[in-house]
Every structure is written in structure tokens, then in C-alpha cells.
Amino acid sequence: MTLITEVRLRKILDSRGNPTVEAEVRTENGGFGRGAAPSGASTGEYEAVERPAEEAIAQARELAVPRIEGQVYAGDQRGVDNALHGADGTDDFSEIGANSAVAISMAAAKAAADVLGAPLYQHLGGAFRGRDFPVPLGNVIGGGEHAADATHIQEFLAAPVGAPSVADAVFANAKVHGEVQRQLDERGVPAAKGDEGAWAPSIDDSEAFEIMEEAIAAVEDEVGFEIRFGLDVAGAELYEDGVYHYGDETRSPDEQVAYIADLVEEYNLVYVEDPLDEDDFSGFAELTERVGDRTLICGDDLFVTNTERLQRGIDDGAANSILIKPNQIGTLSDAFDAIELATRNGYDPVVSHRSGETEDTTIAHLAVATDAPFIKTGAVGGERTAKLNELIRIEANA
């Protein structure tokens, strides 16, 4: 019933105005699914390869589509994704592009869910998923690779951990975003928005921490539940020539570990992503030993949703959480493999958007399907609120 009869590929815009790949999948009995690939700005060295959209589409049409149309069932996600791997023939999707692969993979999953008449999260997670919903991490102050002349730390993330519902959490993050703007206005600091909709003021990191504390305290008073915050340090982007660069100041790897540990203690951080360089497994292990009982130390560039790198982290005790970005690894099956390995070894999966996004909502369903404790998908902006509003709908209809 779910035999795939047609795969269509086209070029569309992402949120940065760059071309990306969209796929549509149809089945023999009318099932339909559409998926669109996101794109990152601060990309890990070990990610699957994203090809220019037109090249990725041409290669996928030539190599992948003939292996799928009339050959594979949308309900067999592993079969779809194995066909994509077979068509590509490399270990990093450098032939057809991870952007084409992930778009087709997501579209096939949606087509299968459509045939079943079930929400995507039920198709992906089955009837036995837990009852908890992910807490959205809202990016409210941004810098690094997402905004020029702003903070060195790439993301300051609101985390409404005490919210009684997803909807309450989503609106709390939007309130924090608005309160940050008010705090900046009071200080006479102008700010545009970065790639992910966060404010990108020309302030130093210490002032950003002050503003986060004040904004969160104000919103906590209004909503009546606990809001903490976290960071995406994007350590690999700060690391060069053996040291971490914060403007004119530098820190050695040992000093960086101590600095992050101090931040966790001082600000009661609930989440710290990529605090160190993407190859510093030992530094991640040391930091996890120091503060891993109090916060999530999450590997993004460290692991790139890759089971081989995650297994190395598990063996070394590096981090206690993994960021899950399907386009980093190329298919939903590969993302699920990373999630399964993580949860089996006590690592929390955190599902994430990319800085260059579309209105695709797959990651909202993936986060719910896999009982992820957090989802990173911004606080405001149409391509971000598409996922947030989908989370609200999922919770309301569950």
C-alpha cells in the first residue's frame, strides 16, 4: 500500500534567502509527504556533506530516485534510507548531498504517516512513546557565527523548565525574547536580529549574562514558573592555534573548562552545548566530570549525530547529551540510530533546528516521538514558530 510511485525534487528558499532542497513523495494509494532540508552556519567538520541545491537535486534525480520509485515502500523507513545510502555510495552523502537525502527521507516518513492517517510523531515513535513533551530552548541573544559584532558565545537560550505545558513554555520564551529587547532599550543598546531570530546586540558576554538574568526574572514573576537558561558556546568557532579567542582575551583548553564550569555554577545553567572544540573529547570528559551532575553537556559539533563519534564520546565519558540534527547525518534512520545509542548509554538526545531553516515541522514530531527532554527551535520568526506551533498542536491533540 505504501509503495513509492513518485519522488519530486525542487529548489526552494531557506530563511537566510539561500536555495535548499525540497522533496515530495507519493505512494500508490495516494499517500503524500513533503520534506525540506535546513542548513547550518556553524557546521561541524565531520557533518555529512551538503551540496549546492541544484547539484544535489540533479545527483539525486539521477542516482537515488530510480532506486526508490516503484522499488521501496514509504512505510519501510529503513528501506528508504538504505536506498539513499546505496545510491550515494559514500559514507558522508558527498555524492547526492545530505540535503537531498534528508529531504527525501523526511518526505517518505510523512507519506507513510499520511497513509496510516496518523500524526508523524506516532508513526515515528509508535504507540509506546512516553507522556512527556520536550521543553523548547529559545534563542534570545545571539552572536558567534549567527551574527557579526555581537557576543562571542553563540546562543543564550531561555529554558522554561517549570512550564506546565508546551504552550506555556513557548509563550514564556517569546516573553523572554521581548523582555530582552526591553532591557536592551533601557540600556540604549540597539540590536538587530541574527539568523535564528535572537537579538544580536554589540555587547560583551558578561553584559549578555546580566540581561538574561534580569529578563528571565521579570518573566518568571509574570508567568509564575521556573525559567532557567543555557548556552551554545560553539567552541569550535572560538578555537584557533590551541587557544579559545574571546576578542583580545584568550583561554587555554584547561582555562576554558574552568571558565565553563564557573558559568554553570554562577548562573545555574541547565544546558551547555559545544563548550569546547569539536575534537577535544578529553576536555568534554573533564567538564562532564566536574558539572555533568548539574547540567546537560551537549555535543553538537563533537558528535554531529554520528554513532561512531558518539561511541567514542561514550567510551571517554565525554558529554552527557547529544544534539540531533537529521541533516548532519543525512537520514531519519541514521538520526534514530544515534538517539538509540545515546539513550541506551544515558545520554539525553536534544533535537535541533539549523540556522538556515524552512517551514518544515519534522523535528517537532521527532522530538516528541523520541521523548527528547529539549528541542532547540528558536523563539520567534516564521520558520521557528512553524515548529513551535506544531508542538502546541501535537500536545493539544495527543
Curated annotation (Swiss-Prot):
Catalytic activity from the UniProt record: (2R)-2-phosphoglycerate = phosphoenolpyruvate + H2O
Keyword match Mitochondrion: no
Record: active site: 196, 325
One GO location term (cellular component): cell surface
Pathway involvement of the protein, from the record: Carbohydrate degradation; glycolysis; pyruvate from D-glyceraldehyde 3-phosphate: step 4/5
Residues bound to (2R)-2-phosphoglycerate: 154, 325, 354-355, 376
InterPro entries found in the cross-reference section: Enolase, Enolase-like_C_sf, Enolase-like_N, Enolase_C, Enolase_CS, Enolase_N
Record keyword Kinase present: no
Catalytic activity, EC: 4.2.1.11
Names of required cofactors: Mg(2+)
Keyword terms: Cytoplasm, Glycolysis, Lyase, Magnesium, Metal-binding, Secreted
GO BP terms, alphabetized: glycolytic process
Binding site for Mg(2+): 232, 273, 300
Predominant localisation class: cytoplasm
NCBIfam families xref list: eno
Its biological purpose: Catalyzes the reversible conversion of 2-phosphoglycerate (2-PG) into phosphoenolpyruvate (PEP). It is essential for the degradation of carbohydrates via glycolysis.
Protein name listed in UniProt: Enolase
Organism, as annotated: Natronomonas pharaonis (strain ATCC 35678 / DSM 2160 / CIP 103997 / JCM 8858 / NBRC 14720 / NCIMB 2260 / Gabara)
